[in-house]
């Protein structure tokens, strides 16, 4: 699911969101970015 990482990691809007990237990559996406403290997979 594209948004499966939203609930797993509350990330910082600015700064380091490696957790989001890792979660999205495990889900089969290229990576992820953080918007409004929520992880969005790309």
UniProtKB/Swiss-Prot annotation:
The entry's note on the tissues where this protein occurs is: Expressed by the venom gland.
Q: Where in the cell is it found?
A: Secreted
What does the record give under GO molecular function?
Answer: potassium channel inhibitor activity; toxin activity
- For the keyword S-adenosyl-L-methionine, the answer is no
**InterPro entries on file:** Ergtoxin, Scorpion_toxin-like_sf
Q: Which GO terms describe its cellular component?
A: extracellular region
Keywords, in A-Z order: Disulfide bond, Ion channel impairing toxin, Knottin, Neurotoxin, Potassium channel impairing toxin, Secreted, Toxin, Voltage-gated potassium channel impairing toxin
> Out of the domains of life, which is the source?
Eukaryota
Disulfide bond annotation, renumbered to this chain: 5-23, 11-34, 20-39, 24-41
Which SUPFAM superfamilies does this UniProt record tie to the protein? Scorpion toxin-like (SSF57095)
| Major location category of this protein | secreted
Q: Per its database record, what is this protein's job? A: Blocks in a reversible manner human and rat Kv11.1/KCNH2/ERG1 potassium channels. Also completely and irreversibly blocks rat Kv11.2/KCNH6/ERG2 and human Kv11.3/KCNH7/ERG3 channels. Also weakly inhibits Kir2.1/KCNJ2 and Kv1.2/KCNA2 potassium channels.
Written domain comment of the UniProt record: The presence of a 'disulfide through disulfide knot' structurally defines this protein as a knottin.
The entry assigns this protein to a family as follows: Belongs to the ergtoxin family. Gamma-KTx 1 subfamily.
Q: What else is known?
A: Negative results: does not affect human Kv11.2/KCNH6/ERG2.
- What is the name of this protein? Potassium channel toxin gamma-KTx 1.8
> What taxonomic ancestry is recorded?
Eukaryota, Metazoa, Ecdysozoa, Arthropoda, Chelicerata
């Amino acid at each position: 699911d594209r948004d499966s990482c939203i609930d797993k990691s509350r990330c910082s809007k600015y700064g380091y969101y490696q957790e989001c990237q890792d979660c999205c990559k495990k889900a089969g996406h290229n990576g992820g970015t953080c918007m409004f403290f929520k992880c969005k997979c790309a």
